[in-house]
Amino acid sequence: NHKSGLFVNGGYTRNNHGGWQGDLTGREKRWHPKDQALMNGMFGFQNRNMNVWYRLDFLDEKIFGPNNGSELQPEKVSDKDFLTKRYTHQLQSDWKLDNRLDVHAALSYQDYKRRTRTTESDLSTGEKWLSSAEASQDITQYKAWIARATVAWNIAPEFSVQPGVEYQWTQGEGGRIDGTPKVSDLAFFLSAEYKPWEWLSLRPGVRTFIVADYDAPIAIPSVLTKFKLTKHMDLRLSYAYGFRSPTLQELYFSFHNDNHDIDGNPDLKAEYSHNITGSVAYRVLHSEKIHLTTTLSGFYNDFRDKISLAQNVDIPNYNTYYNIDR
């Protein structure tokens, strides 16, 4: 039996935290007070062969940063608050064309905006006004699109393939971002599963970039294998060629306050890695009421040009992102 028709649901969560002063005194708090609201709504339609839905998630967060005044003017204080709004839209659909062919499509858009609001106050009179100091008022905004489509095709009982295409686009702007940069790529991927015998399963895969705003490898391969050694013991071995391009934040975002001085590095290169994992699982006990399994696993990772945060070699006490050779 499969239910058909429209469906709707939603949720609301409110988190309030008064902060924690810790070893600080006066108005200052080690953990800043926070007021956070999370809302979501979803509606869609489904029947035996199709499921289509849209979902909206909304975050409204206020982090308050009260400070003490100076020793000479304790009544004059400067407070810094962080106001964040984030909208995430998701549209997804699944179609079952027949017993051997399924199609999946997804589209997502996120709009993130964070405002830094600095206010000056006179505690003796209650007067309050916005600070006019440099960089005291700031808005940072990120927008991101992700579109993805895949096909699951069961060609035979022992063989299936999953081709797909994915597009990603991200843009940032604000007083702490150098210009209005964007990063985008269009990639094609293909994975398969082959079970020539009951005791062996092979899952090869490859991803290639058709268009990219950065240097990308021609192909990113991976392979997963599973060996059924006995009725109660499995061996899994896998290899994956890792690739990660630098994010907008790592490339262009600058963040400076009393505790941090971090600058982006537009000269970053993508990082690469070779990743090997293996595990042996043994089912010690398997009954209707009790399942007991023990697993021994290991891994080996070899990174090249790994992106890491380190001290700026040109400016003391400042940090930036660098590629570590190995």
Which residues are covered by each model-predicted region?
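Repeated loop/turn-to-beta-strand initiation elements of outer-membrane beta-barrel proteins
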Residues: K3-L6, N49-Y54, K62, N99-V103, ...
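Residues that define the transmembrane beta-barrel architecture of outer-membrane proteins
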Residues: P33-A37, L83-Y87, Q141-W145, T180-L186, ...
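Outer-membrane beta-barrel signature, preferentially recognizing the C-terminal barrel domain
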Residues: V77-Q92, K96, T140, Y214-D215, ...
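Membrane-embedded beta-strand positions of outer-membrane beta-barrel proteins
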Residues: V8-G10, G41-F43, Y54-L56, A105-L107, ...
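Flexible loop and strand-edge segments within Gram-negative outer membrane beta-barrel domains
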Residues: N15-V103, D111-K143
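Extracytoplasmic loops and strand-loop junctions of Gram-negative outer membrane beta-barrel proteins
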Residues: Q21-R27, E71-V77, R86-T88, E127-A135, ...
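Residues on the lipid-exposed face of transmembrane beta-strands in outer-membrane beta-barrel proteins
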Residues: N1, G41-F45, L91-W95, A147-W153, ...
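Surface-exposed extracellular loop regions of Gram-negative outer-membrane beta-barrel proteins
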Residues: K3-W20, L59-P66, L107, D111, ...
